[in-house]
């Protein structure tokens, strides 16, 4: 009886060890990594940059109607055409507030993190459905926790892609893609067949090389 009890305890301990080891092995594959190979941290500044070098720079806000004098009207998220511009840093706020690292396919909010902001709208990303243009733009002015502000990060080859994934909705996740408009502006829009493949670079310096300027549609180097 004593040997049987000892064997049971031994099996239980070994099972626990193997389970912990399996969980440890599985964790790295579930965590989003930055370009240095480190886990992307929640609520820490990162630049979202194209995965392919030489295909433009980082992400910044820009108003949709370039002919308007209201620089804060319909602020969409666009990609800088210059590969030397990192854009504005972004923070990721997961639905699960207890996690320290951003997980693959986990619901999260994105928000520009800039001390310089001239517009009254929030910096939280959201989806703006334009009935007139028949397009869905990735814009700012969202609200954390709201249905049109939920996104996910999913793998795309050796890089990642952003997905719009509303919670409590029959709508499946939709790719965030790039579309070049008639003015050559690279806007983030939703797409069923294309994706914007990106990587994440930790923002070590709070002074981005993309500065706010009111005389250039709010941001330089569109």
Swiss-Prot record:
Induction of expression: Induced by infestation with spider mites.
Signal peptide as annotated in the record: 1-23
This protein's UniProt keywords: Disulfide bond, Glycoprotein, Protease inhibitor, Serine protease inhibitor, Signal
GO molecular function, one term: serine-type endopeptidase inhibitor activity
Glycosylation sites: 65, 175
Bridged cysteine pairs (disulfide): 72-119, 165-173
UniProt keyword annotation of DNA-binding present: no
Superkingdom classification of source: Eukaryota
Family, similarity comment: Belongs to the protease inhibitor I3 (leguminous Kunitz-type inhibitor) family.
Biological function: Exhibits Kunitz trypsin protease inhibitor activity.
Name of the featured protein: Kunitz trypsin inhibitor 3
Species classification: Eukaryota, Viridiplantae, Streptophyta, Embryophyta, Tracheophyta
Gene of this entry: KTI3
